[in-house]
Amino acid sequence: NSHTGRDIFALAENLAIFQRASALEKELGVPVAHEMHRGRVTFSAPSTVLLLDALPDMRLTADFSHWCCVHETLLEDQGESVERAIARSFHVHARVGHAEAPQVPDPRAEEWRPALEAHLRWWQRIVDVRKASGASTLTICPEFGPAPYMVTLPGTGRPIADLWEVNRFMKDFLTDRLVV
């Protein structure tokens, strides 16, 4: 997993970085997946699609939570770009984002069910595409993080949910709901 490039670099600068990463990948025999992440060139659907067009061998770490935050939607209007990213995804960061933040406070809460189900659909598509391509593996990491990703109570800094329990829930949710 690599946090490659920056959102503030020109496309040519980012392409040079990705081409170097690709050369290292080939030289060392270590696969590299470039994470979809805010602050990186993969921060948005359109910027990522530009890279996918220019770099036919580019692999992604799918973290749609960042795109939800950046685009302020559950990506209903980004279907083609989401499918393009799914087709290149080799690793999944299973964090659930929403229109205003890259991490829901607690995916077990009913008010976050639409966001959880949207992410599950994307993750299932990744599983399906990987299987159809003959891939024997797909790695998935529940990736709910501590503050500042995790919302805290004002004045105390205490997290509003138990991070360990949230990630355990995600592991169990993925095990129960993904059809592999």
Regions from the PLM with identified roles:
Residues V49, A54-R59, C68-V180:
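Histidine-acidic metal/acid-base catalytic patches
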Residues D63:
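Active-site glycine-centered loops adjacent to acidic/histidine catalytic or metal-binding residues
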Residues N1-L60, E165:
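Active-site acidic/histidine proton-transfer and metal-coordination neighborhood
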